[in-house]
Amino acid sequence: MKRDYTTVLQLTDLHLFADPAGLFNNINTRDSFAKVLSHIHQHYERPDIIIITGDMAHDGATETYRFIAEALKTFSAPVFYVLGNHDHPENADQVYPLEWVTTSDHCLLSDWQIILVDSNNQPMADSYEGEISHSELQRIKAGLNYFIFNPAFSISLFLLF
């Protein structure tokens, strides 16, 4: 039976480590991640899509990205992600050329267009401030303009840049 709604699971700031005993702010992030996933599996239906919004791997290690991919495979849902300031793009790219995990800048889901915004100009930085580059703003503006001039349905939307 077709549902009349869409379920999105957003995960953010996982700060996981390759070392299972790794701590972030005195919290074992792997244990916390496992508890969150277990709770979701027990109490919610399968999401239609999973979106991870930055700081997946605190250490940026390839093994950490593999661990995340394996853990999320249990949902059988496509995964989209944008990296954070603790992530390491080259290591993520080694692991995530998977069919079900992508770093696309947008995703289409039912009647929804989700635009992922990269506010990270300095991967692996210790800075906590995000910054959206001029090129990223131009990409977002172009994407929004496309849908304003090619709408799936009639809407009123005003953009200020």
Regions found by a protein language model. Name each.
Residues 14, 56-58, 85-89, 121, ...:
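Solvent-exposed loop/turn segments at secondary-structure junctions
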Residues 35-50, 128-161:
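His/acidic metal-ligating clusters that form di-metal
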Residues 10-12, 49-55, 79-85, 152-157:
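Active-site neighborhood of phospho(di)ester-bond hydrolases with catalytic His/Asp-centered motifs
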